[in-house]
Amino acid sequence: MVKNKIVGIIPARFKSSRFPGKPLADIHGKPMIWHVYQRATKAKLLDEIYVATDDQRIKEVCDSFNMQVIMTSDTHTTGSDRLSECASRINADFYVNIQGDEPMIDPDSIDSVTQEILIEENENIVASGAFMPINDPSDIIDSNVVKVIISNSGVAISYSRSPIPYPKDGKAHYYKQLGLYAFKKEGLDIFAKNTP
């Protein structure tokens, strides 16, 4: 049996509208992107990890810490767009999009979202995402928290920065996406072709 190649990509941009320079923010003497990269190296299923950026400052910091980095276009509007470009340049069977602003990302979550897409019974699934229940009521109305509606079978149906679902009976269960996605190569190809 041939082993699948699984690559983790950490999109990182300097020009965030809410927090410019966030990937380089100091956390206990190291930049945030370093912490994310180190956590990703603890995931058991990733064969390689890259930081994907369009910013020379981020590249230089990554180089100084011996982190693999790939320069991408500065026209991307989402991390998944940046991931798609990386997939066109890095040959792999699966790509995992790891948020660059999650310095405490759980390596087990990375493995879990990756494992979902590796299961042979899920051969028709081209992407897998991670979500969790919202426990802090303020997150429900926070537009910085992306909410997700989940079907009874655990499939994401819709994403929104608004409070969804609307609590008709006052008993809605809210979930937030973790910004952690695993794609089969063909899933990223579909995504790239359908991005406006």
Could you tell me what each predicted segment is?
Residues L46, A92, N122-I125:
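Short, high-confidence coil segments that cap the C-terminus of an alpha-helix
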Residues N4-A52:
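N-terminal glycine-rich phosphate-binding loop and ensuing alpha1 helix
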Residues I33, D101, K184:
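Residue-level signal for inorganic ion chemistry
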Residues G8, I49-V51, Y95, S128, ...:
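Hydrophobic/aromatic residues located in beta-strands of well-ordered beta-sheets
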Residues Y50, Q56-Q115:
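Short phosphate-binding loop-to-helix
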